[in-house]
Curated annotation (Swiss-Prot):
Residues 34-196 form the SIS domain. This is DnaA initiator-associating protein DiaA. Keywords: DNA replication. GO terms for biological process: carbohydrate derivative metabolic process; DNA replication. Required for the timely initiation of chromosomal replication via direct interactions with the DnaA initiator protein. It comes from Pectobacterium carotovorum subsp. carotovorum (strain PC1). It comes from the Bacteria. GO terms for molecular function: carbohydrate derivative binding. PANTHER family: DNAA INITIATOR-ASSOCIATING PROTEIN DIAA (PTHR30390:SF6), SEDOHEPTULOSE 7-PHOSPHATE ISOMERASE / DNAA INITIATOR-ASSOCIATING FACTOR FOR REPLICATION INITIATION (PTHR30390). Homotetramer; dimer of dimers.
């Protein structure tokens, strides 16, 4: 059992090292897209399933409340957080539409959709991205593996932050770290002296 624990830590560290080399440009571009949207008076919608839903909610909470320093609230909505809306849509046998309907209702041109999917193939996330495209929103996609169907939907203004791993647990760990990086970059760009 102890060896298995060491393997988990070693894999996580190796994934972090690979991501630290491969992802800074994409993470920076994602943060810039979000900052520009916020400066223009827009908002960030975010969604995910399972652990990705937790990461989406963590991002929205960090925007609305704060990340590490006190600062004004920033507009972000976790589309997976409203159980009544989710179950109402799903109850009508529209499971794949649980996020897309919300994007169509709430999303506006200039908003950002933070779409989090470990494999990039979750149908409800794919549909949300398709809806965001029709609303002229920018997409920041957190993926893993080969990026899945999600990667093929992104345009030149969109950003894919693809974790260099084929292990779901490692990808999800790195998605949380990436969300924290995005929050840190947004805060330090919009409120550069708040952490002093």
């Amino acid at each position: 059992m102890l060896d298995r624990i060491k393997v988990c830590f070693t894999e996580s560290i190796q994934t972090q090292i690979a991501a630290a080399e491969a992802l800074p440009d994409a993470i920076s571009r994602g943060a810039i897209a979000m900052v520009q949207s916020l400066l223009n008076g827009n908002k960030i919608l975010c969604c995910g399933n399972g652990t990705s839903a937790a990461n989406a909610q963590h991002f929205a909470a960090s925007m609305i409340n704060r990340f590490e320093a006190e600062r004004p609230s920033l507009p972000a909505i976790a589309l997976n957080a409203d159980n009544v809306v989710l179950t109402a849509i799903a109850n009508d046998r529209l499971h794949e539409e649980v996020y897309a309907k919300q994007v169509r209702a709430l999303g506006q041109a200039g908003d950002v959709l933070l779409a989090i999917s470990t494999r990039g193939n979750s149908r409800d996330i794919v549909k949300a991205v398709e809806s965001a495209v029709t609303r002229d929103m920018t997409i920041v996609a957190l993926t893993g593996y080969d990026g899945g169907e999600l990667a093929g939907l992104l345009g030149p203004q969109d950003v894919e932050i693809r974790i260099p791993s084929h292990r779901s647990a490692r990808i999800q760990e790195m998605h949380m770290l990436t969300v924290n990086c995005l929050c840190d970059l947004i805060d330090n760009t919009l409120f550069p002296h708040q952490n002093d």
